[in-house]
Amino acid sequence: SKKLSLFSDKTEIIPCGVNLNLFKPIDKLASRDKLGLDHNYNYVLFSSSFNNKIKNAALAKLALSNFENIILLEMKGYSREEVHLLMNAVDILIVTSHSETGPLVVKEALACNCPIISTDVGDVKELAKGVENCYIVDYDAKHIEQRIRDILSSNKKSDGRAAVKHFGLEKIATDVYSVYKRVLK
């Protein structure tokens, strides 16, 4: 607030970058094969561990309770390469968190053109603005359920990669370097 406004001319916000060389769209069925996922199901990737209370897995599970052919996957214990495969193998990333900073997982999903359903946390609303098959939702299981149905019936990926191209690691490194140069002058 007041303290921050005193230093606003000396403040620079640099977001977390995304490895756009790794997180990119690849074939869904090939990704499922590599992960051992059945082609006969729809998959929704939960953004974190089910045990993390802030991430609100209960809401995601409730929203999916009326579906028989959907498997909710927990993003826990995967390498970065496996997360990339997951983003391409699943039909939807779901974020039902009570709070977030970024979240980086949304940027990675966008880079893979993975459809997203998210509560209004962190900078998700700004990131998803104008992106096809990316929805900001209330903490309402029925609303989330409807958005899941919308995405599955469209049978389309998102067009999110363009929304995160300025979060590439090279761009972020250049931004950090620029800040250091200004500070050292």
What feature does the model see in each segment?
Residues K24-L37, S158:
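A short helix/loop element that forms part of the nucleotide-sugar donor recognition site in Leloir-type
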Residues L85-V90:
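Short alpha-helical donor nucleotide-sugar binding micro-motif in glycosyltransferases
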Residues G130-K142, D150-S153:
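Conserved acidic donor-binding segment of nucleotide-sugar-dependent glycosyltransferases
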Residues N155-R182:
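A charged, aromatic-enriched C-terminal amphipathic alpha-helix characteristic of glycosyltransferases
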Residues V18, D38-K55, K61-L64:
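Conserved donor-binding/catalytic core segment of Leloir-type glycosyltransferases
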Residues S1-K10, V18, L22:
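A short, active-site helix/loop in glycosyltransferases that binds the activated sugar's phosphate group
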Residues P115-S118:
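Short hydrophobic beta-strand element within catalytic cores of glycosyltransferases
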Residues H98:
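Aromatic "clamp/platform" in nucleotide-sugar-dependent glycosyltransferases that forms part
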